[in-house]
Protein backbone atom coordinates (compact mmCIF):
# COMPACT_ATOMS: atom_id res chain seq x y z
CA UNK A 1 0.00 0.00 0.00
CA UNK A 2 1.34 3.44 -0.92
CA UNK A 3 1.96 5.85 1.92
CA UNK A 4 -0.53 8.70 2.15
CA UNK A 5 0.74 12.26 2.29
CA UNK A 6 -0.31 14.56 5.13
CA UNK A 7 -2.47 16.51 2.68
CA UNK A 8 -4.32 13.34 1.63
CA UNK A 9 -4.97 12.41 5.26
CA UNK A 10 -6.23 15.91 6.07
CA UNK A 11 -8.51 15.87 3.02
CA UNK A 12 -9.95 12.49 4.09
CA UNK A 13 -10.59 13.80 7.61
CA UNK A 14 -12.16 17.02 6.30
CA UNK A 15 -14.99 15.00 4.73
CA UNK A 16 -16.01 13.29 7.99
CA UNK A 17 -18.80 14.25 10.39
CA UNK A 18 -18.11 15.03 14.03
CA UNK A 19 -19.48 11.64 15.06
CA UNK A 20 -17.22 9.86 12.56
CA UNK A 21 -14.21 11.86 13.82
CA UNK A 22 -15.02 10.87 17.39
CA UNK A 23 -15.10 7.21 16.36
CA UNK A 24 -11.81 7.66 14.45
CA UNK A 25 -10.11 9.11 17.54
CA UNK A 26 -11.29 6.17 19.65
CA UNK A 27 -10.03 3.70 17.04
CA UNK A 28 -6.60 5.40 16.91
CA UNK A 29 -6.41 5.40 20.72
CA UNK A 30 -7.17 1.67 20.82
CA UNK A 31 -4.85 0.79 17.92
CA UNK A 32 -1.82 2.58 19.34
CA UNK A 33 -2.59 2.31 23.06
CA UNK A 34 -2.63 6.07 23.60
CA UNK A 35 -5.13 8.60 24.86
CA UNK A 36 -6.07 12.04 23.58
CA UNK A 37 -6.52 13.28 27.16
CA UNK A 38 -4.33 16.20 28.11
CA UNK A 39 -2.06 15.39 31.05
CA UNK A 40 -2.82 17.49 34.10
CA UNK A 41 0.04 19.03 36.03
CA UNK A 42 -0.06 18.36 39.77
CA UNK A 43 -1.27 21.26 41.87
CA UNK A 44 1.27 22.67 44.31
CA UNK A 45 0.03 22.51 47.87
CA UNK A 46 0.54 25.02 50.60
CA UNK A 47 1.16 28.47 49.23
CA UNK A 48 1.28 31.69 51.17
CA UNK A 49 -1.52 33.90 52.36
CA UNK A 50 -1.60 35.46 48.90
CA UNK A 51 -2.23 32.18 47.08
CA UNK A 52 -5.29 32.13 44.87
CA UNK A 53 -8.06 29.64 45.60
CA UNK A 54 -8.58 26.80 43.14
CA UNK A 55 -8.84 28.13 39.60
CA UNK A 56 -12.34 28.34 38.22
CA UNK A 57 -13.08 25.90 35.42
CA UNK A 58 -13.36 27.73 32.08
CA UNK A 59 -13.98 24.88 29.63
CA UNK A 60 -16.83 22.43 29.97
CA UNK A 61 -18.03 19.22 28.33
CA UNK A 62 -21.73 18.71 27.60
CA UNK A 63 -22.84 15.06 27.77
CA UNK A 64 -26.16 13.61 26.62
CA UNK A 65 -27.06 11.09 29.34
CA UNK A 66 -30.33 9.91 27.81
CA UNK A 67 -33.98 10.84 27.41
CA UNK A 68 -36.06 12.34 30.22
CA UNK A 69 -39.15 10.94 28.50
CA UNK A 70 -39.11 8.18 25.85
CA UNK A 71 -41.75 10.05 23.79
CA UNK A 72 -39.37 13.00 23.30
CA UNK A 73 -36.83 11.10 21.18
CA UNK A 74 -37.64 12.90 17.91
CA UNK A 75 -37.46 16.34 19.55
CA UNK A 76 -34.11 15.45 21.13
CA UNK A 77 -32.73 14.21 17.77
CA UNK A 78 -33.78 17.50 16.15
CA UNK A 79 -32.14 19.52 18.92
CA UNK A 80 -28.92 17.46 18.67
CA UNK A 81 -28.77 18.48 15.00
CA UNK A 82 -29.16 22.14 16.05
CA UNK A 83 -26.38 21.83 18.64
CA UNK A 84 -23.92 19.95 16.40
CA UNK A 85 -23.95 21.69 13.03
CA UNK A 86 -23.37 19.46 10.03
CA UNK A 87 -24.63 16.33 11.77
CA UNK A 88 -26.88 14.17 9.61
CA UNK A 89 -30.18 12.69 10.74
CA UNK A 90 -28.78 9.16 11.04
CA UNK A 91 -25.75 10.33 13.02
CA UNK A 92 -27.97 12.36 15.36
CA UNK A 93 -30.30 9.36 15.85
CA UNK A 94 -27.34 7.06 16.55
CA UNK A 95 -25.92 9.57 19.03
CA UNK A 96 -29.23 9.83 20.93
CA UNK A 97 -29.76 6.05 20.94
CA UNK A 98 -26.17 5.44 22.05
CA UNK A 99 -26.32 7.76 25.08
CA UNK A 100 -24.39 8.59 27.14
CA UNK A 101 -22.47 10.52 24.47
CA UNK A 102 -20.49 13.75 24.45
CA UNK A 103 -22.25 16.51 22.54
CA UNK A 104 -19.66 19.29 22.83
CA UNK A 105 -16.25 19.59 24.45
CA UNK A 106 -14.23 22.59 25.60
CA UNK A 107 -17.12 25.07 25.53
CA UNK A 108 -17.61 28.12 27.72
CA UNK A 109 -19.83 28.00 30.78
CA UNK A 110 -22.41 30.18 29.03
CA UNK A 111 -22.51 28.01 25.90
CA UNK A 112 -22.74 24.82 28.00
CA UNK A 113 -25.67 26.30 29.96
CA UNK A 114 -27.38 27.35 26.72
CA UNK A 115 -26.98 23.85 25.24
CA UNK A 116 -28.24 22.23 28.46
CA UNK A 117 -31.28 24.51 28.50
CA UNK A 118 -32.26 23.81 24.88
CA UNK A 119 -31.61 20.06 25.14
CA UNK A 120 -33.50 19.78 28.45
CA UNK A 121 -36.45 21.65 26.94
CA UNK A 122 -36.46 19.08 24.11
CA UNK A 123 -36.59 16.22 26.64
CA UNK A 124 -32.95 15.20 27.10
CA UNK A 125 -30.99 14.45 30.26
CA UNK A 126 -27.81 16.54 30.12
CA UNK A 127 -24.70 16.62 32.30
CA UNK A 128 -22.09 19.38 32.25
CA UNK A 129 -18.63 18.53 33.52
Swiss-Prot record:
- GO molecular-function terms, A-Z: mRNA binding; structural constituent of ribosome
InterPro entries in the record, alphabetically?
Answer: Ribosomal_bL12, Ribosomal_bL12_C, Ribosomal_bL12_C/ClpS-like, Ribosomal_bL12_oligo, Ribosomal_bL12_oligo_N_sf
**What keywords appear on the UniProt entry?**
Ribonucleoprotein, Ribosomal protein
Q: Which GO terms describe its cellular component?
A: cytosolic large ribosomal subunit
Which Pfam families does this entry report, sorted A to Z? Ribosomal_L12, Ribosomal_L12_N
Alphabetical list of HAMAP family matching this protein: Ribosomal_bL12
PANTHER family (alphabetical):
39S RIBOSOMAL PROTEIN L12, LARGE RIBOSOMAL SUBUNIT PROTEIN BL12M
Q: Which family does it belong to?
A: Belongs to the bacterial ribosomal protein bL12 family.
Quote the function comment for this protein.
Forms part of the ribosomal stalk which helps the ribosome interact with GTP-bound translation factors. Is thus essential for accurate translation.
Q: State what protein this is by name.
A: Large ribosomal subunit protein bL12
Can you name the source organism?
Treponema pallidum (strain Nichols)
Which gene name does the record give?
A: rplL
